[in-house]
């Protein structure tokens, strides 16, 4: 059924996309809860070596807010979204492909003056959106990192150990 979504459908998905990105960057987990679908497809194989085909939203929020991942208070991020393409998969599902640049800096302490590690990722991400009770929600992500700057591989090293293929979390992982 792949076809172009309507303007209203795209703007609904853009709203969910903005809420997802900005809640990640501000670490506003209550806000994140409001913009996600009940179940998400999280494909973090590009940096955590893990795919969750059907992760419940509560588990997704716990993972995102974990101090070994984005919940680290010493980690600052900015999820920049560039141009996008949109494809309607079904009446209640849309797939977006978005250009992304995501700088990351982890500081040594709460003074936020000395950077311990920084790494910036550049590429695209396929993201899924679902209509839930007449509102478009963020329903998953698959980042494709084309290149990185600095020590990107070290930014989530602890998270990769915990959430990745050999980690102890993620019963829904593939």
Curated annotation (Swiss-Prot):
Signal peptide: none annotated. GO terms for biological process: melanin metabolic process. Its EC number is 4.2.1.-. It holds the Pfam family Scytalone_dh. The active site is at 79, 104. Substrate binds at residues 24, 44, 47. Pathway: Secondary metabolite biosynthesis. Gene3D superfamilies: 3.10.450.50. Dehydratase; part of the gene cluster that mediates the biosynthesis of agnestins, dihydroxy-xanthone metabolites. The pathway begins with the assembly and cyclization of atrochrysone thioester by the non-reducing polyketide synthase Agnpks1. The atrochrysone carboxyl ACP thioesterase AgnL7 then breaks the thioester bond and releases the atrochrysone carboxylic acid as the first enzyme-free intermediate. Belongs to the scytalone dehydratase family. Homotrimer. Each subunit contains an active site, located in the central part of the hydrophobic core of the monomer, which functions independently. This is Dehydratase AgnL8. It comes from Paecilomyces divaricatus (Penicillium divaricatum).
